[in-house]
Amino acid sequence: MRSGEELDGFEGEASSTSMISGASSPYQPTTEPVSQRRGLAGLRCDPDYLRGALGRLKVAQVILALIAFICIETIMACSPCEGLYFFEFVSCSAFVVTGVLLIMFSLNLHMRIPQINWNLTDLVNTGLSAFLFFIASIVLAALNHRAGAEIAAVIFGFLATAAYAVNTFLAVQKWRVSVRQQSTNDYIRARTESRDVDSRPEIQRLDTFSYSTNVTVRKKSPTNLLSLNHWQLA
């Protein structure tokens, strides 16, 4: 009998020990959702955006900015060089920023960061790039030394200016539509909430009861304080 009891006790201790070690083991099955562990595995290209006007303009802007940057980089000698350096900075910056936005929009990465107003970001980028490309192209054309690379850079600079200007116009329209849609959604939400309150009189009665209770408590509190002070003086 004692050996049976000792065996049962040993099995109980072993099971409890295995439970404790299993609970403290770092190799526990995680409860993290599969969608979060996938990371960038769920990315997919959006062909509708690339086929649309904004997508095509983005692709054209990236290509034109890259060609303008390559043309300006082939110039070996310049005097003065300020206009060349400015055009080089504008073309490189426009290529990088527009390329990043193209990747964000074509892969729907902007949907994962809703805290940023992407329509406004695109509007600022296109407007600023159009203005800077226009100024840089004018300056480079004024300081042109009749070199083939400079002439090509000026031509592609003005083409990039036109592409960014058209995109700015479309981005302004899209931004206005998004602002109007947001205001309309807020108005509909407010109207729905007011109708819910009107259709449920118990909510109004509850609000009225809580308001009357607060008023009653406020009216009674000075009397209670006076009676308490009178009792303390007595």
Swiss-Prot record:
Skewed-composition ranges (Acidic residues): 1-11
Residue spans crossing the bilayer: 59-79, 85-105, 123-143, 151-171
Domain MARVEL, chain residue ranges per copy: 49-176
Region entry Disordered, spans: 1-38
Keywords: Membrane, Phosphoprotein, Transmembrane, Transmembrane helix
Designated name of the protein: CKLF-like MARVEL transmembrane domain-containing protein 4
Tissue: Highly expressed in testis and prostate.
Coiled-coil ranges from the UniProt annotation: none
Record's compositionally biased regions (Low complexity): 15-25
Family to which this protein belongs: Belongs to the chemokine-like factor family.
Role, per record: Acts as a backup for CMTM6 to regulate plasma membrane expression of PD-L1/CD274, an immune inhibitory ligand critical for immune tolerance to self and antitumor immunity. May protect PD-L1/CD274 from being polyubiquitinated and targeted for degradation.
Name of a matching Pfam family: MARVEL
Matching PANTHER family: CKLF-LIKE MARVEL TRANSMEMBRANE DOMAIN-CONTAINING PROTEIN 4 (PTHR22776:SF29), MARVEL-CONTAINING POTENTIAL LIPID RAFT-ASSOCIATED PROTEIN (PTHR22776)
Signal peptide start and end residues: none
GO annotations of cellular component type: membrane
Organism, as annotated: Homo sapiens
Localization: Membrane
Modification type Phosphoserine: residues: 194
Record bears the keyword Nuclease: no
Superkingdom field: Eukaryota
Oligomer status and interactors: Interacts with PD-L1/CD274 and CMTM6.
Membrane-related topology note: Multi-pass membrane protein
Chief location of this protein within or outside the cell: membrane
